[in-house]
Amino acid sequence: MKEGRKRLRAGYCYMLAGVVGVASTGSSRADSEPQSAAMLDWRMREFLTPQQMTTLEPQCRGTYVEPEYGFVNAPSTTSTPDNEALRARSDTLVSPSESAMRLQGNVKAQQGAWWLEADQVELDRQTNVVDLQGLKAARAPGLLLHGDTARYNLDTKDFSLSDASYLIHQRHARGDAERISSADAQLVRIEDGSYTTCDPTHNDWSIAASEIILDREQGEGAAKHMTLRIKDVPVMYFPYLRFPIDDRRKSGFLYPTIGTSNTGRGMSFGIPYYFNLAPNYDATYSPLYMHGRGLLSELEGRWLTEDTYSEVRLGYIAHDSEFSKENPDESGRRWALDFTNRYDVSENWRSTIDYNVVSDKDYLNDLNRTLEIQQETHIKRSWDVAYLGGGFSFKSHVQGYQTVDDDIVDNDRPYMLLPQLSFGWERDFDPVAFGLESEFTYFWRDDENLDPARDQQVVGARWRTQPSLTLPLSTTWGYLTPKLRLDHTDYQLEQRVTGLDESISRTVPFYSLDAGMYFDRTLSLFGDEYNQSLEPRLFYVYSPEQDQDDIPDFDTSVATFSYSQLYKEDRFVGGDRVGDNNRLTLGVTSRFNDRATGAERLRASVGQIFYYEDQQVGLGTEGLSDESESPWAGELVWRPNDRFDFKVEGLWDWQERQTEKGATTLAFHDPEYRKLLNLSHRYTHNDLEQTDVSVLFPVTDSVSVLGRWFFDLVNHRTIGTMAGVEYNDCCWRFQVIARSFLKDADDTENSELDHGVFLRFQLRGLGNIGSRFEDVMAKEMRNFNERETYRAERYQW
């Protein structure tokens, strides 16, 4: 108490001096009577500076501008109030008694970070209580309070404000309250209060509660009898609700999810609940009622330590009514599990587990909302242990599958890897470089329904070793890289057809030469300076033919020919076939690089392979060829700026004068991602031709339309559509889309279209009500998620 009175005595001296002092508020409205705290700092668009306009969205009518305030030459406003004396000025100073002091007329006071403006301030020296009448403004960095009367106890720090309004500048949040009180700086109580992020001229939505408790120490708030109002019309009521007031996680209900069921024309509705179990692990339970199916429950759990991250997702429905109708022999019980774990054992060692399983092949299409499992015929599950460091690499890989489609014959199902051990080593012995890659794999699969007479039951081990020796030679104008690689493989097989070897060895040497030159020049185009390069390249590879027909196919396929295959040593992917090669690739690339930024604006590449011998090694008939030349392979990439991306790649058969394969994509967005345009065309001769168009376009500052059309030109049918509308206000946003998509994406000819409607109602600074909109739109439209990220970072959505 004595220390407090000592600060008071010092404060009185500042007050007396302040009666004739000079103050600066930086606001021409300081002497007017605002109706609320928000109106005091509100500025319409036409009165903003160009700098202030940079953070204002086009549809917003204005924003809040926090003025400069404080006495000239006063202590920093970041000071702690308890350590600062009270400075004040007013028109008059009255001391009616020794225990009282009254400041009247244009009272301005400052203590540390707090700045006060009022009509009258009265200080009781005995009780250390300050009464304020006509409080025009109580400011702290990023915060503004306004009210009728206020009382503050200098000893206990108790504070109360009646007929109050508040403004939080950074969050664009404002509200009113009958009374605001605080027992200390960490606990604030608001009685009959409201909250909104809408501007003070348009109260589109708000939250009202009989009591709101804000616990800054715990980082959470609690509201009693809370009502969400749209245009002053109550639309949702919660008798009690807890919510976070900072970035710390808190348990509680999340905002509802609303969508359509893919059964009939019904809706789906759910209210997730978040469990903040500990600082390093949490869980989310999401019950979702789906019309025509029933109650789907999804549970997501996360666990994080310094070295480990684990995530588990589980979906379960006790009885799917629609599924039971379509599959009378099934119980209707459906489920799915997705588990991932990453463990950084040390700086060099890491373990990764990925386990997925579903009850049936249609689960992911019918029910999946949160599981991160790809819609595939064979669902992978794996465990990896890897080491990387000092030029060495090691990986232990165990991989299995769940074949979700029972119609797939057993011989077409993949082998399990139990395990696959890989080792790599690289070392430079100037001027040569030595490399070694080695891999051991045991392949196994269930052979119960396989035909032993056709060698379908074969399982066994494969050990492949590939040492290499490279002599890299380079200058500023080119390079020459001869390379020798030996590919040796041993097999120990089981359950082979009688007469076929169970022990097989294969050794194939590879000789390759990679050479290129670099020419460049400076040129000017359309007023910009570019550095153009011309890069011819030669690649030769030779490997002799070796009969491999007795070797089973565990994991091997023929790589799809494209531009990227021009400079590869082998045409096979996997270890059961090693190709015979005697071929030369000739290619050339030209680049245009912006001299000011170094960015690549244009790249054009083309090349062709010349075969000097027929390709005799194959998988059945795949991989065999008697052609002397490959099609021309090329690609063109044009990025004139950061907003436009154009790419063409394809294969051209010059002898037949036809395109074998082609793909064209164009993507455009404006600087603020308000306009999006995506075009693509895919073509494979006598097999596939599809076009895909998606667009998002602002009709007005507030309204945007979006759509997509996916069309199959071979089957002359639409295989996907999306149409929607988005309304943006400064404090809320509504999005709705209707989409159709193939039930079986692999069957573009016969698969039926499924339909769905997705919507989201977003309240700025509060949350979303609706479906998992971003997940849907990420698949439908390129750059849509980048648009959402841009809005969140720039406009704090």
UniProtKB/Swiss-Prot annotation:
Q: HAMAP family per the record?
A: LPS_assembly_LptD
GO terms classed as biological process: Gram-negative-bacterium-type cell outer membrane assembly; lipopolysaccharide transport
The record's subcellular locations are: Cell outer membrane
- The lineage's top-level taxon is Bacteria
Oligomer status and interactors: Component of the lipopolysaccharide transport and assembly complex. Interacts with LptE and LptA.
Major subcellular site? membrane
Q: Which family does it belong to?
A: Belongs to the LptD family.
Role summary: Together with LptE, is involved in the assembly of lipopolysaccharide (LPS) at the surface of the outer membrane.
Which Pfam families does UniProt cross-reference here? LptD, LptD_N
What is the name of this protein? Answer: LPS-assembly protein LptD
Q: Where is the signal peptide?
A: 1-30
Q: Which UniProt keyword terms apply here?
A: Cell outer membrane, Membrane, Signal
Q: Which GO terms describe its cellular component?
A: cell outer membrane; transporter complex
